[in-house]
Structure formats: C-alpha cells, structure tokens
C-alpha cells in the first residue's frame, strides 16, 4: 500500500523565513507528511495539507491575514496528536515529527526546529494503535536472484529475527505468516515482480525501496557490530548468512535513520531456520482458520480463539507464534508437553499464578517506550503495577519441575528494586504529560517541595489580594483570574467599571467586562509562575532520570517479560486442556498418525460441547498412506479432514489434543486444498485456483507431509475432473514420486476402485441412515466406499422445490452412470506400488505434476487422456474403441470440448455414444 502523493508547485523565492525553514526541512523528508510544530499545534502545508485534510477529515484553511496565494494548511493539537498520527500511519503514510528545539520565548529570531522521529507502519510505538496479541513487524528483504535474506524487527517489543530463504514461494509464505506492517527492501525485489499488486493489496503492505548504502554487505556488518557492540558476527549466529546480514543491517540502518534513537531495547538478534518449523503456506493457514475465520476474519471461530486463555498481551503474542510456527523437533515438542502436564498436576498453584498475571500490563511494549524515552508518568505507573505481584509468582514457581518451567524460574526476576523506585518517586495520580508537573511525590526531593510551597503561598497571596480589593473598592463581583496570554488579571463587569481605582491598569476590554492588572498582582504572578516553571522543569528532569535508570535494567526486565509470556502461554494451554478434556499426544518419528475419538476443537466449542461425533484416524507410511473419503455434501467430510490436520498441528505446537488417544508422527508440512472461490482480482477461475494449489502441493510436499485434499477436479467437467483426481492419487501414492500421508475426499466414487489396485490406498465413507426419501447424516467415518452421493436428498434438505426434486429423480434414473464405474473397475493404474519400474513408467508418460505446471492448471486434450487412458500398445489394458467401425464415435469424442460440458451434458453425450456402440454389437 504505497500512497500516491500530490505535487504542488512552491514559489521558493517569495517564501517567508518560517515557510523557507519549513520548505528546507520538507525537502529532506519528501516521502513523509511533515508535522511542523507551531506553538500548541502541528501544522501541515501544501500537498501534505491536502492529503491530511482528506484522510483526517479536518478543515483545510490558510494562515490568517495571508493573501490568496498563501499555501493551503491544516493542523492538529499537540496534546491529541497520537490519534491523528495513528490514522495517517494506519492509512499507509509515513509521518515526520518536526519539533521546536528551543523555547520560543528565548529564541532570537526564527525558532529552531528539527525532525525528531519518523513514524511509519512498522515503527509505530503507540500501544493504543497496535494489536495487543500480535507483533508489529518491520521486515527487511535482501533479494539476490532466487535467494533472500529476511530480517524481522518488532520495534514495540525489541524482538529481532533473521533467516535466509531459497525460493520466491517460501518468501511469500514468510510474508503471509508474519504479516509485516511494513517492508523495506533492495531494488532487486521490486524489479523481480514477485510482490504483485494483488498480493500487496491482499496483505495490506507498505513497501519502501532503499538505496544501496542501506544494504551493502560491508556497511551492514559495521551497523550490526556497532549496534550489538561486538567485534565479530559469529557469536551472534550469523556466520555464513550473508543475505541475512545484509537484511539485518538494512533494517537497523532504516530504524536509526527514522527513529533518531539508540534502539537500546533491541538487545538480541535471533537466527531462525524454516526447517526447524512445520511449513504452512497461506492457503493452509486460511483453510484451517488458525488465527482468524476464513469468511469474517474474526478471532472468534478460529483455533486461536479456543486456545487463547492468556492473561497478558505478551503471553497472547507468544501463543499466536506457536500456532504460526509448529515445531518439528521431538525433544522441543515433548518439553512443551511436559510444561503443560506440570501445570495440570498442580491446578491450585497454577490458578494462583494466573490470578497474579491478571493485572500485568504489556511489559515488553512498556519497556520499549521507556528505552525510547517516550514513556509518560502513567506508563511508569502501569509498569510498577505490573511488577507488583512478581515476587508472589516467583515464590510459586519452584513447585514445578519441568525443564521449561525451571528455565523460566531462572530467568524470572522480581524487579522489586525497580518497583520501590517508582513507588517512592511518582504520584499515583500523575498526569499523562511530562510537562504539566504534579509528577513527583512530596518528600522525594527537597527543591521540589520548596518550589511547591512557594507556588502555593503565591496563590494564597492572590486569593487574599482579591478579598482586599473587593473591600477597598466595593466591587463585590470582582474576580482575579488567569490565562496564558495575560497571566493574572482582575476582571470587573461593566456595571462596576466606574468604581475602578486609578492605580489599576486596563489590559483588555470585553463586551460585558474590563480586565485590569496592578503592580502588586504582577509581583505575585512572577513569584507563582517562576516557581511553577522551575518546578515543572525540575520534575521533568527527575522523571527523565528515573526513566533512564529503568532503561538501564533492560536485560533483567526483558528476560522477566519473556518468562512471564512463556508461563502465561503454557498456563493457557493447560487450562484449555483441562476444560475441554484434551489428552497428551504421544510423538513419534515413524510417520504414524493414530487418533482415537478425535474432535474438531472449534466446531465442538461452537456447539457448546454437546453432540459432536468423534472419529478415528489412522495413517502411516506403509499400507495406510492414503484414505479416499466418499459421502454426500453436508455429511462432515471437510470437518473430519480439517480436524485431523488441526490435531496434528496442535500436537506439534506442544499442546494437548482433542482426542481420547493420539500418537502423532511429526509432519514437516501440512497442505490443504479445501474449497475454492474465483480469484476475480487476478483473473483466475475456481478451477485455475484449484489446479494452481494442487500443483504447488505436489511440487513442495514430501513423504513426511500431511495432505488434506477435498474435491480435487470438481471445478471442471466430470471426465476431466475424474481424470485429474485419479492421476493425483496415483502420484501421491507412489513413494518414489511423493508418498505423503493423505486424506482425499471426493464425489468421484470411481476412485474407490483404487483400493486394492494401489497397496496403500484405503476407502472410508461417512455413514448415512436412509429413511425412505430422507437421510440422516451420522457424521461417523466408517470403512468402505460410498455407493451413492445422496445429492438429491441433500437438495431436499436445502429446501429445493419439490418439483425440481422429482424431476431430478427422473433424470437420475435415465443418466445412471454405472457404465463409467464399470470402466473404472477395469482400469489399471500407473506407477502402482513401490516398484522402481512403475515410477519410471509414470514419469516417462508425463506425470501429473508436469501436466499441471505446463498447462497452468488447465488440462490439455491429449494430456487428459494420457492421465487415465491405458497405453494402446499394452494388450492387457482396456481399449474403449478397439474396432475400426467405431471410428466415428472416437472422432466425436476427440472433438468434444470437455471443458465446456456440465456433468449432465457429459453424461447425456456418453449415454448417446454408448447406445450407438451397443447397437453395433460391441
């Protein structure tokens, strides 16, 4: 989402000194909207004013007293700037904050100004604008041919990750996974066209192309060494990761330039490798609804909604990251499961800790604001309140003995000394602003106390003076008031102005009153304002010093925040496991997936826990590699398949699972092809989307992957679809080609013929009870294939008119397609079993993956026949047209445009051909 900016012409020669200053600063930050501080407002001029007035819905005006050629302008009050700033940033704009760097009262001539910070979507620190449970990542991408260096920084928490990728597909998957608020990159990425307009819009990305100086290798190395204060990069784990080093240096340079800050809260850099986590592409994340629902993009109804019972924002972000990056290391998975079991065994102590976590604010983001020097007094009070109960939590942690919880106990610091410092210094009712005073408690500093007394005494003297003047003049409604323009003044209504004494000096005339000053009143004013001004300055200095002292403890605080996040996340998984009756899964490395009484956790939760039908699943790498699942729509096939994928994924994040027993073989990837919708924005039809996804799965899956395939081939004509579905199953089943564990739901009952022909394919169906013309879905997976699709009965349940139902029943009798099934029974498969020769034959005859990629997902007429039709030279295989007298039928078939036929049309034509051939005695 890169915003087009307007381009007004500016007459530089005729600018006033102030506008010339504005112009010079704006030139340096031409890609930003410049917030130019003038008194109590941030003003915008020219193009910035035109843009901001529309986005912020504020009035566009001109400076008072200016001529008609004066620039358009608009402004926002400084005390409410965050609201307007966030609106612009969330709309994809960058904003440069230009402050007055000297007191206007002391300035000789034009007040000095400079940009103190640039706020962008990836560098926003305002917690009110950020999603609590989600990281706000800035992503740096260094593209070198098909290799990529990736750096991810969450400025609001200090988290810093780097990795390297070796394909554009994996790059898009990482972007989809981390959902960066902003991307900075080298020119190569832009030129490559990998990030299409459709992808950028879909992901709501703000992208900035940086100059070479940001990402040159030598400059990047210097930047990283300087920031982390190291002599070599090997100790940071970056050895041999040249592209990652360039991307890390790139984001650090960008942050230093935009934030004008030391970034002291970014204290570690963590290399990660995609091979350490289960790979989930964007389609799978959406189809499994891990963090948001597919339709409404809501958290409610997602897997995260079920699992997230965290009490802190830090714990919620960590739990979300578990879902986004399931583990593939058995020891790491078992360690997480041990932590959950530890909490389950001591529920009373667990609930005590949970209660203490409840008032904890977002320590990670508060710490970032403290280090940025942007934390206000109330932020420090929130920090203090967050650490108040840390000693109580620390005292309970020794009751747990699992490895992870012991590690958290070691990391956990009570931070009692910091609590005492804040408690001793800051007023409990301190204001938001650091420039309003009333921040520091009485008794903390002698000079503060003396100045407060002077200010209070001065105000008392003013009050006494008011009473004296009333008595002296006889003006009973006389009032002494104050404003920032005139200071203290005496106000008298017009009805009493004739009684005003000669020693008063008139200052202002109003419609109904007059305002006056006296020498004595001015004397008191100087006493009060002098004390107040010094008081505000001193309070700010003391507050800033305290804030810096806390920032110096960043390592202790950061470790404690991470421990709190981990404890909170695992308590959440423990609470859900207990309340939802989840069980601890066994983890194996032999590729066995054995689930007893499995449930879909989200569907069960939405149903209120009652009536969900449990189902078993068994898959392995030998005789139970592929399950062909048949049955009518609405019967529960998709729910069953998704539930299996979710149970596997939950096990690999280290969670207990919704089943009575589960033995889960570690999967390196989960792919789903479930449902489709036309991608109109990119001009892709349902079938093209489907075939593209299938091609992606077959290219990127491995023997250790889990595939969830629903209705492959349904987006085209019956024969095309059946051909493709058959060929895909053949391909997956062959361990020399793929051999992945697969749940394959289909309406093509002909595919049930593959059981017995392929040694690792088994048929399952959804049990249905028939009651006359009505059916009842039992939601139970049973062995065997379905012999009916029950489409007409489902149509009846959906409310299709009776006349349509009756006509459909008549047509069904006429269009009985058993002949197709008989042909399927006589088909032989290619590449069956584990034989090398079978695999070789299949590849030589052009396998399905080549077919899909070469045709872009759309079948070629010759290829579609090769996928299912036997080799004509093989006498053991079936020949549909073995006689020359049927050449006219063959010609008709060859000329038929299958992609334009509906299933009904296809069956009608097939029926006509069959009658013609049978009439000739074949």
What do the PLM-derived regions correspond to, one by one?
Residues 2-342, 358, 362-371, 375-467, ...:
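Charged catalytic and DNA/RNA-contacting regions of genome-maintenance
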Residues 15-19, 35, 46, 75-85, ...:
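Amphipathic alpha-helical transducer elements in NTP-driven molecular machines
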Residues 883-922:
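C-terminal tails and terminal domains of large nucleic-acid-associated
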Residues 46-49, 241, 311-312, 322, ...:
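ATPase nucleotide-binding head domains, primarily ABC-like/P-loop NTPase cores
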Residues 362, 372, 376, 386-389, ...:
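Charged, surface-exposed helical/loop "interaction arms" that form contiguous linear patches used
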Residues 215-223, 278-282, 294, 385-460, ...:
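Amphipathic heptad-repeat alpha-helical coiled-coil/stalk segments that mediate oligomerization
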Residues 427, 510, 514-548:
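Extended, charged coiled-coil "arm/hinge" scaffolds of SMC/Rad50-like chromosome-maintenance ATPases
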Residues 98, 121-130, 262, 398-404, ...:
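Active-site phosphate-binding and catalytic loops of NTP-dependent enzymes
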């Amino acid at each position: 989402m890169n915003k087009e900016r307007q381009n007004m012409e500016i007459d530089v020669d005729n600018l006033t000194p102030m506008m010339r200053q504005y112009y010079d600063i704006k030139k340096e930050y031409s890609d930003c909207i410049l917030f130019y501080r003038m008194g109590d407002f941030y003003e915008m001029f020219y193009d910035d004013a035109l843009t901001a007035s529309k986005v912020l819905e504020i009035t566009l005006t001109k400076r008072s007293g200016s001529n008609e050629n004066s620039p358009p302008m608009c402004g926002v009050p400084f005390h409410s700037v965050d609201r307007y700033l966030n609106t612009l940033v969330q709309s994809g704009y960058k904003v440069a904050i230009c402050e007055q760097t000297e007191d206007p009262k002391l300035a000789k001539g034009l007040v000095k100004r400079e940009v103190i910070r640039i706020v962008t979507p990836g560098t926003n620190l305002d917690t009110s604008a950020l999603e609590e449970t989600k990281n706000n990542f800035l992503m740096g991408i260094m593209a070198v041919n098909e290799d990529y260096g990736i750096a991810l920084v969450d400025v609001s928490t200090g988290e810093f990750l780097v990795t390297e990728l070796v394909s554009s597909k994996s790059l898009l998957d990482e972007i989809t996974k981390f959902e960066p608020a902003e991307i900075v990159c080298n020119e190569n990425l832009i030129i490559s066209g990998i990030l299409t307009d459709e992808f950028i819009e879909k992901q709501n990305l703000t992208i900035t192309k940086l100059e070479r100086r940001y990402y040159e290798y030598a400059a990047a190395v210097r930047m990283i060494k300087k920031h982390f204060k190291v002599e070599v990069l090997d100790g940071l784990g970056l050895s041999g990761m040249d592209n990652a080093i360039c991307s890390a240096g790139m984001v650090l340079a960008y942050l230093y330039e935009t934030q004008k800050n030391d970034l002291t809260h970014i204290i570690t850099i963590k290399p990660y490798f995609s091979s350490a986590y289960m790979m989930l592409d964007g389609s799978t994340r959406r189809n499994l609804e891990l963090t948001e629902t597919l339709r409404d993009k809501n958290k409610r109804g997602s897997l995260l909604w079920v699992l997230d019972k965290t009490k802190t924002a830090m714990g919620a972000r960590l739990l979300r990251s578990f879902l986004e990056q399931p583990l593939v290391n058995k020891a790491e998975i078992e360690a997480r499961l041990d932590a959950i079991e530890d909490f389950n065994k001591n529920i009373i102590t667990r609930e005590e800790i949970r209660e203490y976590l409840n008032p904890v604010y977002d320590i990670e983001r508060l710490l970032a604001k403290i280090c940025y020097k942007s934390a206000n007094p109330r932020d420090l009070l929130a920090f203090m309140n967050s650490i108040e109960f840390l000693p109580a939590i620390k005292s309970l942690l020794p009751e747990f003995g699992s490895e992870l919880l012991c590690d958290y106990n070691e990391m956990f610091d009570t931070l009692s000394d910091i609590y005492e410092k804040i408690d001793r210094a800051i007023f409990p009712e301190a204001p938001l602003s650091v420039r309003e005073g009333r921040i520091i408690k009485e008794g903390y500093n002698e000079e503060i106390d003396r100045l407060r007394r002077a200010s209070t005494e001065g105000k008392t003297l003013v009050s006494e003076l008011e009473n004296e003047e009333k008595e002296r003049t006889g003006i009973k409604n006389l009032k002494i008031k104050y404003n920032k323009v005139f200071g203290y003044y005496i106000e008298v209504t017009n009805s009493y102005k004739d009684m005003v004494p000669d020693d008063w000096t008139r200052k202002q005339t109003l419609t109904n009153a007059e305002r006056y000053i006296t020498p004595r009143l001015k004397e008191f004013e100087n006493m009060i304002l002098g004390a107040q001004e010094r008081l505000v300055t001193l309070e700010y200095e003391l507050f800033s010093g305290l804030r810096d002292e806390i920032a110096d403890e960043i390592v202790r605080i950061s470790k404690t925040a991470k421990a709190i996040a981990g404890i909170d996340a695992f308590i959440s998984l423990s609470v859900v496991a207990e309340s939802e009756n989840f069980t601890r899964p066994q983890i194996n490395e032999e590729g066995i997936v054995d689930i007893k009484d499995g449930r879909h956790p989200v569907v069960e939760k939405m149903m209120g826990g009652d009536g969900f039908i449990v189902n078993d699943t068994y898959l392995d790498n030998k005789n139970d590699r592929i399950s062909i699942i048949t049955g009518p729509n609405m019967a529960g096939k998709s729910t069953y398949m998704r539930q299996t994928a979710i149970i596997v994924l939950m096990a690999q994040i280290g969670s207990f699972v919704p089943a009575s027993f589960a033995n889960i073989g570690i999967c390196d990837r989960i792919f789903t092809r479930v449902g489709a919708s036309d991608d109109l924005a990119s001009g892709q039809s349902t079938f093209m989307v489907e075939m593209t996804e299938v091609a992606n799965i077959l290219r990127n899956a491995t023997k250790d992957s889990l595939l969830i395939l629903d209705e492959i081939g349904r987006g085209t004509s019956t024969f095309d679809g059946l051909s493709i579905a058959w060929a895909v199953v053949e391909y997956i089943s062959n361990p020399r080609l793929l051999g992945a564990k697969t749940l394959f739901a289909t309406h093509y009952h002909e595919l049930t013929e593959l059981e017995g022909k392929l040694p690792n394919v088994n048929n399952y169906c959804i049990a249905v009870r028939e009651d006359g013309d009505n059916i009842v879905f039992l939601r139970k997976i049973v062995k065997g294939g379905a012999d009916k699709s029950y489409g007409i009965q489902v149509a009846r349940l959906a409310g299709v008119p009776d006349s349509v139902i009756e006509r459909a029943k008549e047509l069904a009798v006429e269009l009985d397609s058993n002949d197709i099934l008989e042909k399927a029974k006589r088909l032989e498969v290619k590449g069956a079993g584990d034989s090398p020769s079978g695999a070789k034959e299949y590849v030589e005859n052009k396998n399905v993956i080549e077919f899909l990629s070469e045709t872009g997902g759309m079948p070629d007429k010759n290829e579609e026949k090769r996928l299912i039709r036997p080799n004509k030279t093989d006498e053991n295989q079936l020949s549909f047209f073995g006689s020359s007298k049927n050449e006219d039928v063959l010609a008709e078939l060859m000329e038929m445009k299958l992609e334009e036929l509906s299933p009904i049309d296809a069956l009608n034509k097939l029926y006509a051909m069959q009658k013609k051939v049978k009439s000739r005695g074949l």
